[in-house]
A protein has these predicted regions:
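Acidic/polar-rich alpha-helix caps and helix-coil junctions
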Residues: 1-93, 103-202
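Membrane-interfacial helix termini and the short, flexible loops that connect transmembrane helices
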Residues: 98-99
Length: 202
């Protein structure tokens, strides 16, 4: 299956690069907020990571423009399915462990969830912070995700200093105009990120 997925992504990128769709495609076919090329690169990075091709995963992650978000848009007519299942039906909600197990001061927890303390069968439940309305968009990828894929690939390729810099780049990311989770944490000392197990755990 992975081979087929990667082949489809390679084909999609080749066709998109060859044609470079014009205004008709961009205004009438492409969903608003979708960046086709960056999304293909991000999917290649994800699936190459799963396939264990660290060099290819790193190469694809490095091609993603981290200053660009790519999202799936929704509206009151085409409702965000996570919002629908979580807010209207109440079937899907995040467990409070996402928030409680986060490192102290990690701003990504509050980006993703809001405290609700709803009684669940196993754990108390929170609410999704990012899917509070019918029209909330769903990102195809986050820039920080691409940085972490790169960090993992660098670790597995033996580049500990490069991986450490990538991990700390994610930890210290704070501010900016993009709607993305930002940790706003301090960088970790080199001595805490000087082995592959430490980097992969982080």
């Amino acid at each position: 299956v992975l081979t087929s997925v990667l082949a489809l992504l390679d084909s999609a990128l080749a066709q998109y690069s060859a044609v470079r769709p014009g205004s008709e495609f961009n205004t009438s076919i492409r969903a608003a907020g979708l960046d086709v090329e960056n999304t293909i690169y991000a999917m290649q990075a994800r699936y190459q990571r799963i396939a264990g091709d660290h060099s290819a995963a790193l190469a694809a992650a490095n091609l993603v423009n981290l200053a660009v978000l790519s999202v799936m848009p929704f509206s009151d007519q085409a409702i965000n399915p996570i919002h629908d299942l979580s807010n209207r039906a109440g079937y899907v909600k995040p467990r409070d462990t996402l928030r409680l197990t986060a490192e102290a001061g990690d701003a990504r927890a509050a980006y993703h969830v809001t405290v609700a303390a709803i009684r669940g069968n196993v754990r108390p439940l929170d609410n999704f912070a990012q899917y509070a309305s019918n029209s909330s968009s769903i990102p195809f990828y986050y820039p920080g995700e691409m940085r972490l894929i790169g960090a993992e690939a660098l670790t597995n390729l033996g580049d500990i200093p490069g991986a450490r810099a990538a991990v700390n780049g994610v930890r210290t990311k704070c501010g900016g105009s993009l709607n993305e989770p930002k940790a706003c944490l301090a960088a970790l000392a080199d001595t805490l990120l000087d082995t592959a197990p430490e980097l992969l755990a982080e």
